Amino acid sequence: MARDYYEILGVSRDSSKEEIKRAYRRLARKYHPDVNKEPGAEERFKEINRAYEVLSDNELKARYDRFGEAGLSGAAAAASGFQDFAGMGGFADIFESFFTNFAGAGASYARSRQGPVRGDDLRFDLKLEFLEAIFGGEKQIRISHLEVCNVCGGSGAKPGTEVKTCPTCGGSGQVRRATRTPFGNFTQVSVCPTCGGSGQVLEEPCYNCNGEGLAQTTKKLRINIPAGVDSGTRLRVSGEGDAGRRGGPPGDLYVYLFVEPDPDFQRDGLTILSEVRVSYLQAILGAKVSVPTVDSKAGLEEEVELTIPAGSQPGTVLTLEGKGVPRIGNPMSRGDHQITLVVEIPTRISSEERELLMRLAELHGERINKRDGFLGGLLRGLAQMPGNREREEE
């Protein structure tokens, strides 16, 4: 009767994948034929490999937990009237075993497992103030990513120790197992459980990276923010992702920008939007008022003098050309700044002002309610203009 695989590795049934892996590595080093010359060590080593091959594979582990060794041979599935191919490693492995016999595809597969692997890309979310997005600049960020271990140089081996050819697969990175199916006998090709497909094993793993060849490192980066960016803009920083494995190139860092709102300005594409409050007399008679722009708020210039034409209506939009958002890649080309007039109607006036307004209303032949004073006639008309009616409702 076959021994229990969990018992072989000395782990419980609820052990994590990482715990199973650690137990396997510890036992594999202890009973490796190159290290342990005692009788029975080689058979024990094969037993350990078989146990790890099953328990490290989610599908095989699930079948073993449910049906035991019989579930791995297909007996449990056959009893239910059909053949389950989950334990065969998939049809890709079957086809691969065919081509291995005729075209040497197995060697190609092993080389792909042992070849360079590009590092993972990383994402970093960066908040910008409104004016930082408009004018750009430089931001310093701190990221954590994988870099080639500075102790072992990426080999994964402790300095002074060797990286040896895997004795299980002979350096090919793969193992073969004969499988019986309703279609006949097939040779299944799978990743070597000892070396994980690399074809090499460590005499002793590096203490800094635990044999991975890569170590987590925190570093500072300076990111150049182009003028005119907006929320959702993505910046690519080449080569600042995780380091590659086995000499592969590093991944990239993608910085996603999120722009915070501003109390004075809004943005619509390349257009800056704002409001300016003027009195009803300024709207009627015309005036010149100072208004802030994104440039003045950034300290690049003084506030701009805006001309209010006589007879301006509430909601009138005045435009400052070239005072908007710079175009990305061409900061000399800018959008406009559109300013909406908000006409303020006073709720209290002096008796002298009321007398003047009543005389003005009489000149225009306006009928006014004397009990309401200035709330009638001209001022009533101003108050009922669309832009100001909305503001009164607020």
Swiss-Prot record:
Name of the protein in its database record: Chaperone protein DnaJ
Gene that this polypeptide is encoded by: dnaJ
Cofactor(s), names only, from the UniProt record: Zn(2+)
Keyword Ion transport found: no
An annotated Gene Ontology molecular function: zinc ion binding
SMART domains: DnaJ
BP GO annotations: chaperone cofactor-dependent protein refolding; DNA replication; protein refolding; response to heat
Binding site for Zn(2+) 2: 166, 169, 192, 195
HAMAP family per the UniProt record, alphabetical: DnaJ
CR-type Zn finger ranges: 136-218
Coiled-coil spans in chain: none
SUPFAM superfamilies assigned to the protein according to its UniProt record, in alphabetical order: Chaperone J-domain, DnaJ/Hsp40 cysteine-rich domain, HSP40/DnaJ peptide-binding domain
Cited PROSITE patterns: DNAJ_1, DNAJ_2, ZF_CR
Cofactor note: Binds 2 Zn(2+) ions per monomer.
J domain span: 4-68
Location (main, coarse): cytoplasm
Quaternary assembly: Homodimer.
Cystine pairs: none
Binding site for Zn(2+) 1: 149, 152, 206, 209
Similarity field: Belongs to the DnaJ family.
PANTHER family, sorted: CHAPERONE PROTEIN DNAJ A6, CHLOROPLASTIC, DNAJ HOMOLOG 1, MITOCHONDRIAL-RELATED
Compartments (UniProt record): Cytoplasm
Reported function: Participates actively in the response to hyperosmotic and heat shock by preventing the aggregation of stress-denatured proteins and by disaggregating proteins, also in an autonomous, DnaK-independent fashion. Unfolded proteins bind initially to DnaJ; upon interaction with the DnaJ-bound protein, DnaK hydrolyzes its bound ATP, resulting in the formation of a stable complex. GrpE releases ADP from DnaK; ATP binding to DnaK triggers the release of the substrate protein, thus completing the reaction cycle.
